[in-house]
Amino acid sequence: MRLLSFIYLVWLALLTGTPQVSATDNGKTSDVAWDKYSLSVKGERLFVFSGEFHYQRLPVPELWLDVFQKLRANGFNTISVYFFWSYHSASEDVFDFTTGAHDIQRLFDYAKQAGLYVIARAGPYCNAETSAGGFALWAANGQMGSERTSDEAYYKKWKPWILEVGKIIAANQITNGGPVILNQHENELQETTYDSNDTKVIYMEQVAKAFEEAGVVVPSSHNEKGMRTVSWSTDYKNVGGAVNVYGLDSYPGSLSCANPNSGFNLLRTYYQWFQNYSYTQPEYLAEFEGGWFQPWGGSFYDSCASELSPEFADVYYKNNIGSRVTLHNIYMTFGGTNWGHSAAPVVYTSYDYGSPLRETREIRDKLKQTKLLGLFTRVSKDLLKTYMEGNGTSYTSDDSIYTWALRNPDSDAGFYVVAHNTSSSREVTTFSLNITTSAGALTIPDIELDGRQSKIIVTDYSIGSESSLLYSSAEVLTYATLDVDVLVFYLNAGQKGAFVFKDAPADLKYQTYGNSNLSALETSQGTQYSYTQGEGVTAVKFSNGVLVYLLDKETAWNFFAPPTVSSPTVAPNEHILVFGPYLVRGASIKHDTVEIVGDNSNSTSIEIYTGDEHVKKVSWNGNLIDTRATAYGSLIGTVPGAEDIEISLPSLSSWKAQDTLPEISPDYDDSRWTICNKTTSVNSVAPLSLPVLYSGDYGYHTGTKIYRGRFDGQNATGANVTVQNGVAAGWAAWLNGAYVGGFSGDPDKVASWEVLKFNHSSLRSRDNVLTIITDYTGHDQNSQKPIGTQNPRGIMGATLIGGGNFTLWRIQGNAGGEKNIDPVRGPMNEGGLYGERMGWHLPGYQVPESALDSSPLEGVSGAEGRFYTTSFQLDLEEDLDVPIGLQLSAPAGTEAVVQIFMNGYQFGHYLPHIGPQSLFPFPPGVIYNRGQNSLAISMWALTDAGARLEQVELKAYAKYRSGFDFNRDWTYLQPGWKDRTEYA
């Protein structure tokens, strides 16, 4: 393989004369340019270390900054963001970009404030396991025609969206002082016909033109759906529709929640793929596995150890570095919550995703491990221009080790990425590595790899203005150019490391402070310093001024290099070094004080190196702490945690209950409901009976729908009913108030066909009423047959058995349908249960005296429904971040549909018979940490066995003393109850 690589390089040199390639731009702006090595922003090469974030899944704008600060602190310089059309458009030609969490200008402002670039992804189609893939639900009833093509019907629907959201994206481009550096066209749209007249090609041209019309000038991108097709690259069969920067999506883990030993098989073909299909462009992994979604009936994220492992981040992300990737987006980095009815049927309420940052905004070990790579790429400028020197198993003394060898053609810096050839191996292997350096060919002995570990070995690596490494078998975490050059290494505890300074004096003296003792060995290439990594922080001060920190991996997890600048790019002299806390959000130096803002769960020691001899004091979240100075120039102290604070959450009591299924009664007045009188549908899927009963045809798209069908006579013995509301969605039916059957939902079935059997004694000679109540788990994605996102929802067909026909059907759904009567929470928050339509879930609702004193623990004894409400007070300390959730459980065999509403937000869809989720977190802003909270639970039984819960309990996940303000006035996000009688 090394010989082949050499031949390739000779051929490349003959062909081009030089390995350098001048930067290319799109002709609209030179602020963002690219070549085959990397992206350049404002003339500076950038390693795009990006995390996927969906603001819709966290409907509290202030918390976007919380997440962004955590990403910035953990080495990210960019976020990738979907903009869901569905969230901003409740009805045709109506857009909301200003109300509550719909205000995306705040998203851009917070990203800029946090020091993050933005990759904008506005579709029109997004997927992201969101309902209808992000299409506006009003358009997903069939009226779009052939979606994701040049179909005129589709074009007329999506173009206004792109023009509106595009204007805001354009206003926030890097060219206008904003953070947007790339703009994605569409999403995972597979190009299968390379013909300029192909409908998809025309469509991609239309999307490009629409963004251009909106004023977007930054380079365009796209994300290939795995290595299945080759789509929209200027370097491969470009007949139109191609983007400027080609990207690839890859989820290669093949991990199993049930079996942590399965999967973990690396793909080592990214380099070849990009060389074949986008060779003039930098390698861009537009979505790379940060976790994986879980379906109804699957596993819950917290129990999926294989997806949560920091080893995954270590091995897989470094493999991408070895493949020459320089644009790297982790999907998801923060998943959030599918609150309301925003989920596609393939996922449940939680969209935690097993991501590095938990749904509760807590930092997982996976994020701590990811940080080690993020901080490394931030300072490793030579990594941004490399060629593939070679790869394979011949670089080491043990052929069980695979090596990527990258070389910078200008500086000759080398990057050797080593891992087990069998990536799932748990063997501990010691080997030597053959390297090429400015001092010639060398061999580094005694490199150790634990199972499922990878390392980046550097050669001729600059660590400051006057210092370089000839090589190091310890991994570089970061370096800083301060009063002296400061270098930070890390290794697993107990592993051996060695490094050699380049062109350093032979008689260097050093002093060690800590548990890792250094030894020096003179070689022909210089002095090799060797050590065995101990636990904690070890500092080594050399007589030439260089300061080296040696950290074990777990200590490195709690190391931060907070920038002293606000820009996403951070030079080695623009950050300081902090060891110890759970999180460092930011740092600044004012006179003789370094001011640090951060979070801590437990009291910890803290060490700060600023390189400023005038700094004598440390403040933590505004409070000075006692410190002592070390002999090598740092300050050490202790920062407080929250371990001594008792969190006492109230028990939930004083429940009130009301009937939320009054429509079961044949005497219920439905005269104001929508009459189902259509004999044709806008949908191309033909109904199984008439009139059309698709809910979307009548303007009801989300949540529970209720149908009431009337017929005369006593001849009917039953009814054939087919319902399609997404996998796991159940439904139930009542004839004249008597339960007659239904379907409890199945995670493997998108629709159900059931025969309802009527009891003759329940029939009346005139005006029989069949009431059908349906659950809903979302609109399908584009890939679901027959017509993707436009697959109908509701009753597909309903016919009587034994004679007679239905004489009238009426439907009721969410209050107001497409009117969006609660614009703050938006068009997907509510469904059509009576309690929802009446606003019983909203703050300020006054329960009537007629309400029952009953709790969800009592439940219902038959096929009934109840809406339970209570309130509780929280009074957490002001400087605490305490993620809080609601724990539910139900007796085995319970078949019911349960929803949780916290201060009006539907933040839990619980199906106890399907699962897996039973603990539902609420972010601050949805829940008041210091104030009054309104909690509502709707529950209806899917069978006549009834339903109840056996646990309804507030639960604290953890507690952190925080420098972020989580206790604000959230009133603007929680509009209260208003009379809704008209929607009865």
Curated annotation (Swiss-Prot):
Residues 1-23 form the signal peptide. It is found in: Secreted. Disulfide bonds join C257-C304. The active site is at E188, E287. InterPro entries: Betagal_dom2, Betagal_dom2_sf, BetaGal_dom3, BetaGal_dom3_sf, BetaGal_jelly_roll_dom, Galactose-bd-like_sf, Gly_Hdrlase_35_cat, Glycoside_Hdrlase_35. It catalyses: Hydrolysis of terminal non-reducing beta-D-galactose residues in beta-D-galactosides. GO terms for molecular function: beta-galactosidase activity. It holds the Pfam family BetaGal_dom2. GO terms for biological process: polysaccharide catabolic process. It is an enzyme of class 3 (hydrolase). Its EC number is 3.2.1.23. Its main location: secreted. It comes from the Eukaryota. Substrate binds at Y82, N127, A128, E129, N187, Y251, Y353. Glycans are attached at N197, N276, N391, N421, N434, N517, N602, N677, N715, N720, N759, N805. The keyword Secreted applies. One of its GO terms (cellular component) is extracellular region. PANTHER family: BETA-GALACTOSIDASE RELATED. Belongs to the glycosyl hydrolase 35 family. Cleaves beta-linked terminal galactosyl residues from gangliosides, glycoproteins, and glycosaminoglycans. This is Probable beta-galactosidase C. It comes from Aspergillus flavus (strain ATCC 200026 / FGSC A1120 / IAM 13836 / NRRL 3357 / JCM 12722 / SRRC 167). The gene is lacC.
